[in-house]
Amino acid sequence: SLLQFRKMIKKMTGKEPVVSYAFYGCYCGSGGRGKPKDATDRCCFVHQCCYEKVTGCDPKWDDYTYSWKDGDIVCGGDDPCKKEVCECDRAAAICFRDNLKTYKKIYMAYPDIFCSSKSEKC
């Protein structure tokens, strides 16, 4: 669920997820179009593509099972769909962490009007 994803992001990056990522670039948050602005925005693009492949559950609202081990996220549970959603969220949280050095405040609350180029395919 988005609430669990938020917790993963907070723990991985130390940033407040809603403020820092909900409206970042062209792909973070709902929707998405154009070319990702930087590595962080590409994390969101890949995350959206991952969600699009999930069938059988609702990635935004269905809770999944996960835990922390040695600073890493471990997805678990018996439901394959929910586990897949967890893996999507895990990969994005790690991607955000790995790209903290290139995070740009200029892309926070980025206006959609600047995301008008042709969208990439997943």
Swiss-Prot record:
Keywords: Disulfide bond, Hemostasis impairing toxin, Ion channel impairing toxin, Myotoxin, Neurotoxin, Potassium channel impairing toxin, Secreted, Toxin, Voltage-gated potassium channel impairing toxin, Voltage-gated sodium channel impairing toxin. Its main location: secreted. Gene3D superfamilies: Phospholipase A2 domain. It is found in: Secreted. Disulfide bonds join C26-C115, C28-C44, C43-C95, C49-C122, C50-C88, C57-C81, C75-C86. One of its GO terms (cellular component) is extracellular region. One of its GO terms (biological process) is arachidonate secretion. It holds the Pfam family Phospholip_A2_1. Expressed by the venom gland. One of its GO terms (molecular function) is calcium ion binding. InterPro entries: PLipase_A2 (IPR001211), PLipase_A2_Asp_AS (IPR033112), PLipase_A2_dom (IPR016090), PLipase_A2_dom_sf (IPR036444), PLipase_A2_His_AS (IPR033113). CDD domains: PLA2c. Negative results: does not show hemorrhagic activities. Snake venom phospholipase A2 (PLA2) homolog that shows local myotoxicity, apparent anticoagulant activity, and neurotoxicity. Shows analgesic effect on mice due to a decrease of action potentials and nerve conduction velocity. These effects are caused by inhibition of voltage-gated ion channels (potassium (Kv) and sodium (Nav)). In addition, analgesic effects are antagonized by naloxone, implying the mechanism of action is correlated with opioid receptors (probably indirectly). Does not show detectable PLA2 activity on egg yolk phospholipids. Belongs to the phospholipase A2 family. Group II subfamily. Q49 sub-subfamily. Monomer. This is Basic phospholipase A2 homolog Gln49-PLA2.
